[in-house]
Amino acid sequence: MKRMSAARPARWTRRHLDLLVDAAATTAPVIDPAAMPRILPDHDLWDLWPVQEEDGSTCVIGGQELWMALSAPILGHPEERHDRARIRLLAKDGDSWTDLGHAFADGASPGSREWSGSAIRRPDDTVSVFYTAAGRRGEAPPTFRQRVVEARPALVADGRRILLDPGAEHRELLRSDGHMYLPAEELTGAPGRIRAFRDPGWFRDPADGRDYLLIAASVAEDDRFGGAIALAGTRDGAWSLLPPLVVAEGINHELERPHIIVHGSRYHLFFSTQRHTFHPADFAPTGLYGFVAPSLTGPYEPLNGSGLVLANPRAEPDQAYAWLVLPDLHVVSFANYRSSPGGDLRSAQADQARAGFGGTVAPILKLTLNGTATSVVPAEGRRTSP
């Protein structure tokens, strides 16, 4: 496809992080554990996203919204859930969630795990599910090869039961080119310490009506802290990689779950990252970060000067993660780890970590956007329902 004219990638630097301050406008309230009902009693849920219509709204079937999330059986240490991750289909009616089972049939994915993505209902009642295939089908132990895959199953409504046709083909769309973006093909690794080429977020640019994917990626920097947000575009069904929109200049390893919301004719680019992936670790909080630009390709500038949009509170620095901003500016996430006297639960014994892990939908928040300034405001009347 013909390359878009693009501004140079925005560089997220130490200078920006030096502007970061504790402020109520960018701090989430402490989560009450009672406000986090477990949707699936035997499975962890994390990394939620709605099935969208092509206009960006959430798909509604028979009065129920369709959502997806990553899921894994509640076994062992919560960090091991990534080695068993499958995409789950969910229906939501108000504050009530219904489990619709795995989105795909066993063995349908080319990977050994299914990691985060996005989903769009098409006019022909199929659903384009863009997701990350991690590893290779049938492998043991799991590896960390990552590529972007599309499945396009038919949406089948049978009474109040909603299904995706299990016979859909899973087609690899993109993998890192090894030039603009580093290969994400490690055989061994762990969350927060591997290269990225994952989390495809679908976006239709109102300026040209074309479809794009935003991808969490890695670029070559002087050290390993070269997280980036890749852009890919399609023409006549063929996808190709474009230059990155944002590059972390030696300050962060992972810019995860990138997505764009157009608000007030401005392009708001959001992503999530964790405190332990900064350089040095804990230099900045786990949170939702973002940039804003007049067009898809920039030029981008960090929101609130630093890029920080929404941080976990100091008292609970890991309480939630994987924030996703919806078109109405409500923000969904999942409940991660509560604070523990024993320190970081990611490295704790399995039983201690399990006792402090949420593994379900976190309370809903809402943003206001005003130029380069943002603020967290109460999502009135909403608990776990965007």
What are these regions (language model features)?
Residues 1-386:
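Carbohydrate-active catalytic/glycan-binding domains of CAZyme proteins
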